[in-house]
From Swiss-Prot:
A motif (Cx2C motif 2) lies at residues 249-252. Residues 1-134 are annotated as: N-terminal SAM-like domain. Its cofactor is [2Fe-2S] cluster; [4Fe-4S] cluster. Its main location: cytoplasm. One of its GO terms (cellular component) is mitochondrial intermembrane space. This is Anamorsin homolog. It comes from Phytophthora infestans (strain T30-4) (Potato late blight agent). The lineage of its organism: Eukaryota, Sar, Stramenopiles, Oomycota, Peronosporales.
Length: 277
């Protein structure tokens, strides 16, 4: 990459006439040279920001600069690069470059947006104080940007579907779909009675439930048959029969009967009770 066109040079050199002449001879494609003198008590950043050149963004095709403290290189590049045109060339001179220092410089140039960096050991008439100087030559990357088309949200709304009810929907023919609850089966239905009649075989004139009885005949046959006298003569084995169903066992003959006093032969209902029901 060769310097060409309008080039700015930052240097601490006071008398730059001979240096500029030598620079043009070395770089014949350079048409014009602008020298930005850096004072002894100043630095590159202060010189660029305080000079009239700072108002001329993208003014130069090339910039020649130097760095005395690579720790401040990022700040210096932030001040210098706005003056460089897109695709322009930056030539940076640094003295006493070691391997670790070189890597830091290359990283700073890359972060600054410079590409195609090359380095070589080279002295410059603008920096006679630099011993073993290395020049880093880079190109300012051109970042092209384009507008991203935005998808415009459609303002057209779809019509909301509505249910429509016609008068014919309430005709007499719809009554056929309504279930009559009186036709539903219950435990006393004749169908259930017929199922009991078909269950098992009659033995000695008494129906005996089949092995897998589901009609309730088995439970009915297994229920103990006791007379009222037998019920009154029963003695509680658990002692809780008189307390009510909540305390009675599953086979208690008093299930379903109200609570009574211990020792009572019969269970009487007090119909004259004034308690609220």
């Amino acid at each position: 990459m060769a310097l060409q066109g309008n080039v700015a040079i930052l240097t601490r050199l006071q008398d730059t006439a001979s240096a500029v002449q030598q620079f043009k001879q070395t770089n014949p494609q350079v048409a014009d040279v602008t020298v930005l003198a850096v004072a002894e008590d100043s630095d590159v950043t202060q010189t660029v920001t305080s000079s009239s050149a700072s108002a001329k963004e993208n003014a130069f095709d090339g910039i020649v600069s130097f760095s005395e403290q690579t720790e401040e290189l990022g700040i210096e590049l932030g001040a210098v690069l706005p003056l460089l045109k897109t695709g322009g060339v930056l030539q940076l001179h640094v003295a006493n470059v070691k391997e670790e220092k070189k890597n830091a410089i290359l990283m700073a140039l890359m972060i600054g947006g410079l590409v195609d960096t090359s380095d070589k050991q080279e002295s410059s008439p603008f920096y006679p104080e630099f011993s073993d100087a290395v020049s880093f030559t880079s190109k300012k990357q051109s970042f092209e940007s384009a507008a991203i088309p935005l998808a415009v949200k459609s303002t057209t709304t779809q019509p909301i579907k509505k249910w429509t009810v016609l008068a014919d929907d309430f005709g007499d023919d719809q009554d056929d779909d309504i279930i009559d609850e009186d036709t539903l089966l219950d435990d006393t239905d004749e169908v259930l009675q017929a199922a009991k009649a078909d269950c098992g075989d009659a033995v000695g004139g008494k129906k005996r439930a089949c092995k897998n009885c589901t009609c309730g005949l088995k439970d009915e046959n297994d229920k103990p048959v006791m007379s009222e006298k037998d019920l009154n003569s029963l003695v509680s084995g658990c002692g809780n029969c008189f307390k009510g169903d909540a305390f009675r066992c599953g086979s208690c003959p008093f299930l379903g009967k109200p609570a009574f006093k211990p020792g009572m032969e019969k269970v009487l209902l007090n119909l004259d009770s004034s308690d609220d029901i």
